[in-house]
Structures are given as structure tokens and as C-alpha cells.
From Swiss-Prot:
InterPro entries assigned to the protein according to its UniProt record, in alphabetical order: Spc2/SPCS2 (IPR009582)
Organism this protein belongs to: Dictyostelium discoideum (Social amoeba)
Subunit and partners: Component of the signal peptidase complex (SPC) composed of a catalytic subunit sec11 and three accessory subunits spcs1, spcs2 and spcs3. The complex induces a local thinning of the ER membrane which is used to measure the length of the signal peptide (SP) h-region of protein substrates. This ensures the selectivity of the complex towards h-regions shorter than 18-20 amino acids.
Lumenal-side segments: 74-80
Domain of life: Eukaryota
Recorded topology in the membrane: Multi-pass membrane protein
Family, as annotated: Belongs to the SPCS2 family.
Disulfide bond annotation, renumbered to this chain: none
Name by which UniProt lists this protein: Signal peptidase complex subunit 2
Keywords carried by this UniProt record: Endoplasmic reticulum, Membrane, Transmembrane, Transmembrane helix
Transmembrane segments: 53-73, 81-101
Localization (cell): Endoplasmic reticulum membrane
Record GO biological process: protein targeting to ER; signal peptide processing
Length: 183
């Protein structure tokens, strides 16, 4: 006679400090990424993030060259000027990427031929968490929705992830219907 025991791993509920909008937004954003990559089996596209890291590495290298260049100060002015100028250019490129390309997008993901972007906004002192799911190739196909964060956190600050994932499921089904109509 054999006995089979199943062990279930229960995740510790996520606690946040109520009225800390940054922590609340980060918790909700992380949950969206978890839902899209786990439940919907999308693969997260990190190309833009890797590009930003590469530019940051180049900027740090320029700063190190400017600091540790072997020739003393008065003679190394052209090198310092070049390093500072290139650092400014790299900073402007990173700023451009953040403001005009990445915008409020927290996730870019793909599955077979389907590519999506998810943007979120939680304004300070506003209880409504806004999510926009859109097709990465055709931004006119999008599903925006806004819900109060009170639905996803109890009075002690415990994150009610299943409630949030249920709402996400409904929105992603709407998005899938719109996406199929367009194809």
C-alpha cells in the first residue's frame, strides 16, 4: 500500500504600506508581468532594457576614462571635454528612450506572432490604477481599463492577487477578441 502526499507551496501574501503609491504600483506592475509570463505564456522582450544598460555601461566607462586618464589635468583637457560631451550625448539618448520610446510601458512581450505592450499609470493621490494593453505592431488595437486599488488590497495592506488576476483575465480576453478581429 502506497500513500501519495501532495505538497502545495503557498506563497506568502504580499504586504504593502497603505498610502505608499510607489510600492502599490510596483506590486501591481510585478503582478502583471507575472500573470502575462506565467498564466498567458508570453516571453518578455528585454531588448530595450539591455540597450539602456549598454548605454549606461558606456557612460560609466567614459566617466572612468575621464577620472583615471594617466596624463595630469591641464594636459588632458581635450580628453575630459570629449568624455563629458559623450556622456551628455549618452544621457540624452537614455532620456529620449525613457520618455519617447518606453513611455509608461512596464512590459513588452511576445508569443508566436503576437506582440503586446502593457502600460500602467497610478497618479499620486488617485486611487485608480490605469492599465493599457496594446498590440505592439498596431497601437490602435488596445484595451484600456481603470480600477480602484481598493479592490486589490485589504485594509491591512495585503495584496489580493487573485482579484487582480481575475480582472486582468477579463481584459486580456477582450484584447484577444480585438486582436483576432484585426487579423
Amino acid at each position: 500500500m502506497s500513500t501519495t502526499t501532495t505538497t502545495t507551496t503557498t506563497e506568502k501574501p504580499i504586504q504593502v504600506t497603505l498610502y505608499d503609491s510607489n510600492t502599490i504600483k510596483q506590486t501591481l506592475d510585478d503582478s502583471i508581468v507575472k500573470y502575462v509570463t506565467s498564466a498567458l505564456s508570453y516571453t518578455q522582450n528585454q531588448k530595450l532594457n539591455y540597450t539602456k544598460v549598454l548605454f549606461g555601461l558606456i557612460g560609466c566607462t567614459l566617466a572612468a576614462i575621464a577620472q583615471f586618464y594617466p596624463i595630469p589635468f591641464p594636459k588632458n583637457k581635450p580628453v575630459l571635454i570629449l568624455c563629458v560631451a559623450l556622456y551628455v550625448v549618452i544621457s540624452l539618448i537614455l532620456y529620449y528612450i525613457n520618455i519617447f520610446i518606453q513611455k509608461d510601458y512596464i512590459l513588452q512581450a511576445s508569443k508566436s506572432n503576437d506582440e503586446i505592450k502593457v502600460a500602467t499609470v497610478l497618479q499620486k493621490y488617485d486611487p485608480n490604477y490605469q492599465v493599457k494593453i496594446e498590440n505592439a505592431k498596431n497601437s490602435s488595437i488596445n484595451v484600456p481599463f481603470s480600477k480602484s486599488i481598493d479592490l486589490y488590497f485589504d485594509t491591512k495592506g495585503t495584496f489580493l492577487e487573485s482579484n487582480f488576476h481575475n480582472d486582468l483575465s477579463v481584459q486580456f480576453k477582450k484584447f484577444a477578441k480585438l486582436n483576432v478581429k484585426d487579423k
